[in-house]
A protein has these predicted regions:
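Membrane-proximal soluble regions of multi-pass membrane proteins
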Residues: 1-14, 142-207
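Membrane interfacial helix-start motif at the N-side
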Residues: 13-43, 81-91
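Short, amphipathic, aromatic/basic-enriched membrane-interface segments that mark the entry/exit
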Residues: 24-27, 61-70, 87-95
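Core segments of transmembrane alpha-helices
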Residues: 32-40, 77, 96-104, 157-158
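Juxtamembrane "helix exit" motif at the C-terminal ends of alpha-helical transmembrane segments
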Residues: 37-61, 100-112
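Structural signature of hydrophobic alpha-helical transmembrane segments
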Residues: 61-75, 119-124
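Transmembrane alpha-helical segments that form the membrane-embedded catalytic/substrate-channel core
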Residues: 81-91, 105, 109, 125-142, ...
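Cytoplasmic-side transmembrane-helix entry/capping segments in multi-pass membrane proteins
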Residues: 93-102, 120, 150
Length: 207
């Protein structure tokens, strides 16, 4: 059951989207979540052994020719994420896979060629992006981030779901988008009902 839920796009997206209904908060996440992922990949190189190349191969690319690629822990993490996202939603996952793999490769390149500057700016951008997201939730969404309820959502799936938000905005799979909107609306209404009941219960106890 747990495994099937992990691969159920509608269940996972509905949970995520119910925490992100405010347009300003959504926009903040569209920019900040990929930034957090990329900078985290850069910063991961500081873990002993993470920057070590486990293998190297030449990747032929149009216009760029043969590009040397080092297989490192950050790159493997990007590959694992890409594979998971393809299982969740094949087309959107395949469209996003090149971006994820580029993130992994560029994190290797930046760490190897601009070590001090890369770590400094990655650290600043990482912290600033998290702060921006907490502001988005506190000031605009009015609800604590999903980080407090689901680490999987916050640390793995968020980057794919902001990608889906962009695709839906561009007209991707409108029937799926409508279905997810309806499910999210139900989830948000249920959350607000529960919050109202808790508030009434607290008020009754105070009397």
């Amino acid at each position: 059951m747990a495994r099937s839920r992990l691969l159920n796009l509608e269940d996972q997206f509905t949970f995520y989207a119910s925490y992100h209904t405010n347009k300003v908060n959504v926009l903040i996440h569209v920019f900040c979540v990929p930034t957090i992922l990329f900078t985290a990949l850069v910063l991961t190189h500081a873990i002993p052994g993470a920057a070590e190349s486990l293998a190297r191969f030449q990747l032929p690319l149009p216009l760029l020719g043969e590009v040397p690629v080092d297989v490192t822990v950050p790159l493997l993490y990007a590959v694992a994420n890409a594979a998971y996202f393809v299982l969740l939603e094949p087309v959107a996952g395949l469209l996003y896979a090149p971006i994820l793999l580029t993130f992994g490769h560029l994190s290797n390149v930046l760490y190897a060629t601009h070590h001090d500057e890369a770590m400094k700016f990655a650290g600043i951008a990482f912290v600033a992006s998290w702060i921006a997201q907490f502001v988005g939730h506190g000031k605009f969404e009015g609800r604590a981030p999903a980080l407090l309820d689901s680490l999987l959502q916050s640390l793995v799936l968020a980057v794919f779901f902001v990608w889906l938000e962009v695709l839906f905005y561009l007209g991707y799979r409108p029937a799926l988008f409508k279905r997810l909107q309806n499910r999210t609306g139900v989830a948000v209404a249920e959350y607000r009902r529960e919050q109202a009941e808790k508030k009434r219960a607290r008020g009754a106890k105070a009397e």
